[in-house]
A protein has these predicted regions:
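Aromatic/hydrophobic beta-strand junction motif of beta-rich domains
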Residues: 42-49, 126-134
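Extracytoplasmic/cell-surface-exposed regions of Actinobacterial cell-envelope-associated
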Residues: 126, 130, 143-148
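Secondary-structure-rich domain cores
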Residues: 122, 126-129, 137-138, 160-162
Length: 210
């Protein structure tokens, strides 16, 4: 999930949380049925602006879920219901040292209508009703036809519907998707130098344009 170009990862002799800045990545949902109800959580750490590579016994657990470690990143994919709408507390351990990251996880966004695998009439004002998840910073709705696309950047604080111009679409299979970026207003940490978030959520359904 995390792909960062730059200098080689830093190996520290002391990886106590007081030496580290934490970066939390949350990706909720996906573009197909296999990922729609999956949340990926990844946590990486840096020191003096360089990513850390762990080589000792460091561990990270979030609400009892142990995140597997790869190099300097702890990363796990879980059913979205595992964390959605709940207070999540992540405990990082390095030897006797403990640091925590806590936040309320967002619920998944949803496309309420049209329904999955339904037939949708092409028109100048094709309605898409949706629910955003959590505290959104930016999002958009997009409709894809066999050879065209239409999208909208909804306005307002919590809109629930957009109208898309799908007249240029050909008949046939397509998709409707909601892509959302979010923050976590109550995100905080104990023991670390700092904590930051990168959050994104996606929901997509298949439809047939007629």
């Amino acid at each position: 999930m995390i792909d960062v170009a730059g200098p080689p990862d830093l190996i520290l002799k002391d990886t106590a949380p007081g030496h580290l800045a934490a970066s939390l990545y949350l990706s909720v949902g996906g573009y197909d049925a296999s990922t729609r109800n999956i949340t990926e959580m990844a946590v990486s750490f840096s020191s003096q602006g360089r990513r850390i590579r762990f080589v000792a016994d460091e561990t990270l657990t979030c609400n009892g879920v142990a995140l597997p470690r790869g190099g300097g990143t702890f990363d796990a994919k879980v059913p979205t219901d595992t964390f959605a709408g709940k207070l999540v507390t992540c405990n990082y351990r390095s030897g006797p040292s403990l640091g925590t990251i806590a936040f309320t996880a967002p619920v998944a966004p949803a496309i309420v209508s049209p329904q999955e695998n339904s037939e949708v009439a092409r028109s100048a004002r094709t309605p898409v009703t949706f629910r955003i998840g959590g505290h959104s910073t930016m999002f958009y709705v997009i409709a894809l036809g066999p050879d065209s696309k239409a999208w909208s950047d909804p306005t307002g604080t919590r809109p629930t519907q957009v109208l898309l111009d799908t007249r240029a679409f050909s008949q046939g299979p397509g998709f409707v998707a909601l892509n959302q970026f979010f923050d976590l207003p109550d995100l905080h940490s104990t023991g670390f130098q700092s904590v930051e978030l990168h959050g994104q959520a996606v929901q997509q359904i298949g439809v047939t344009w007629r």
